[in-house]
Amino acid sequence: MTTELEIQKAGKETGIQIWRIEDFELVPVPKTNHGKFYTGDSYIILKTTALESGRGFEWNLHYWQGKESSQDERGAVAILAVKMDDHLNGGPVEHREVQGNESAAFKGLFPTITYLIGGVASGFTHVEINEVEDRKVLTRVKGKRPVRATQVPIKWTSLTDSDSYVFDIGKEIYVWSGPKASHFEKNKAIQYADGLKNERQGRAELHHIDSLDDKESRTMLKDFFGEAFPGSIPSGESDTVQQVGTTIKLFRISDDSGTLKITLVSENSPFNQGDLSSGDTFVLANARTNHIFVWKGKDSSRTERASAANPDNSFFNKIEMPLTSKLTVLPEGGETANFKSLFTNWKSSRDQRGLGQVHSINKTAKVAKETFDASVLHSNPKKAAESKMIDDGSGKTQIWRVASLRKEPVPKELYGQFYGGDCYIIMYTPQRGANVLYYWQGNKASINERTALPIQTKNTHETECDGNASQIRVVQGTEPPHMMMLFGGKPLIVHLGDTISPTGKSKAASTRLYQVQSFFAGRCRAVEVPAKSSHLNSNDAFLLITPSGSYIWVGKGAVESEIQGAKDTAGILKISKYEIINENQEPNEFWTALGGQSDYWRDEREEGVPVEPRLFEMSNATGNFIAEEINSNYVQSDLNPDSIMMLDAWNYIYVWIGKEANQEEKMSFKSLVDNYVKTDGSGRSKDIPREVFDQGKEPLSFTGHFLGWDKTLWD
């Protein structure tokens, strides 16, 4: 009866509700104990959020299983989660959480997660923990975001040299950190102990232990452990987190034959949305992130849905995933951005939310001409984050072409023109703030030039910028909005071939075809393509230059800024006369110049799916790429000065180098980022621009991803 009443209360107002499973019933946990979990128990956590429309709610339902919880409790929590999901009409996104391997969404619910020894079977209940008498508790503080405070047995062997500990004896609270513990964990242990002190309203004293064998602490520790300090503390293991694997597979769960079967649909990601059908339940197993998604078709049977929501060992064996994998259950129509990013051109009717933009996978959404007001960037950080802009590009620009082991200045009259067979360094000096170095790699650049490019960029960073510049790697075709703004409103032009003359220009072909696309604030790229009709595209405008005359071809989907961009390109290339023709109204001479009429792309470009930015802390401690994803509600204080952080904004990657990051990480982070992009299963371009900068030199486009950025936070 208690369970039915609690389910009726679930999800009716915004906030977090938590229940512990006691004798197969839901028992609410007081808000003062949210974030504290007994390792012998299982819990349901429901987060309710109001829709932006104001008409209803959306829910994230987590069912958490402690490492020491019984099989009955684990089964009960899954069954009760399904009941709550049914009560909410299948609307929640469900997450199976295993102690120590919780999802980023779960970790984002609590500033600290505390694991308490015992459980309901041992008589432990969630009561106000502010008593100061008869206490003896040893807590290990480990991890980053959030910190995990785990009660451990009161033995000397529970200590390691890489973690921090809190010795709680009621009226006295002691903090000790191993010599290899990070600064971050040391500070968090102090904060955790200070929180215990505050709970006791001044009835406890806080002390710091510098050495386990000094005179002041020797007596206390002997009383606490029941024996003297053994003389040494063992080494601890690193808090290893997410390791990239290799496979991403899609399975179908169906009981159409009368027997529940799991069959492989595809192991070639990104998948097609058409691989899913409403009549069945599907499982997407991502071994690269140890994450399992269960997609519930709206017409799938309850048996199919329940089998995936409460999986047994055979389920994990069948899909070749570890038992500790994160598991997220999604209703049809309630797919998360991370799930949709593993499909090509997912079509959704749901509105976009958050800082993420709608980006296309291997496509580019065009933007009509608009006025860009750089003054709003400082007052509107979100705008800076969305636009990837630091200013309006009106500062000073200097460009060099990289030739083998040297760089050559590009004549100013050729600024904005690049050759696809070359590499370039663009140094931008804004009117305020640090310099920006774009190092641009043409798609046809030689291996020698591609190798020399980062070396010459590093040299430029030291000699021209005094070591004070953001460095942004750009591959042809992925130029970020700010780089597009550096050429006085003119198109960015990319020619075929490479530079072979001292003037910085290569001899042009007699017939040339330039594809013109509009992007941020109406700025255009004009890219030379082979002069064949098969390279036309109905979505764009084209400039065709021939010995007998020139044409601007206007595709049916071209916007005004693209037509103007084609005109501007003609002017830059000294083409004073041209004929403007619309698609399907071409003269014979036009097709003759292109080698005859043939098929070309005529379909409208599709928009991609909304993908919200993701923050990672990077590590190469094991020799493989390892990244810990920070909870989805990340804040500025999640940036760890001891580490290198990566913010994946989908079509742009930021790398933040903390002041205390070690030299090995600084030397290897580029390969770690490359591996991250290479192993991404979304199908997006592997040539995403990457911007690298030091702590304290963050661009507006980065800080705008953090609510209320504080420049003095680390002072």
Curated annotation (Swiss-Prot):
Main location: cytoplasm
Induction statement: Interaction with actin is suppressed by PIP2.
GO molecular function, one term: metal ion binding
Residue ranges that the Swiss-Prot or TrEMBL entry lists as coiled coil: none
Described purpose of this protein according to its UniProt entry: Calcium-regulated, actin-modulating protein that binds to the plus (or barbed) ends of actin monomers or filaments, preventing monomer exchange (end-blocking or capping). It can promote the assembly of monomers into filaments (nucleation) as well as sever filaments already formed.
Region annotation (Actin-severing) ranges: 1-124
Protein name from the UniProt record: Gelsolin, cytoplasmic
Renumbered residue ranges of the record's region Actin-binding, Ca-sensitive: 384-715
Amino acids binding Ca(2+) 3: D642, E665
Keywords: Actin capping, Actin-binding, Calcium, Cytoplasm, Cytoskeleton, Metal-binding, Repeat
Binding annotation for a 1,2-diacyl-sn-glycero-3-phospho-(1D-myo-inositol-4,5-bisphosphate): K136, V137, L138, T139, R140, V141, K142, G143, K144, R145
